[in-house]
């Protein structure tokens, strides 16, 4: 019986390949807690970044070679997340989540993002409201 003829061995190869790919991936995950009266201004800056990303990571610019996925979120902050019936605070939570093919792609991303006219504002927001700043995080679990 050939090595590839055994479905179990083929499955092991597939899993090992996925583990190798996963081990190369790196992430940027940023979390912000922003006063509600500043949330729209913060979101406007984040929308500038997402618009830049749409172009920078387009197929024409070989984007899939560097960026795997990206999503930005906005949610009211609960007083008690274990009991949402207690209501929300006067703050909004934003997250920026970007998954890259490698740490080199993150370096490329940061280097190019810093050239944008909105980036000083982006940095100010990070300094003022950033609560979780992770550049180059390793994925240790993922579904899809």
Labelled PLM ranges:
Residues 3-112, 128-144:
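Short S/T/G/P-rich N-terminal loop/turn motif that feeds into the first structured element of a domain
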Residues 117-133:
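ADP-ribosyltransferase catalytic core
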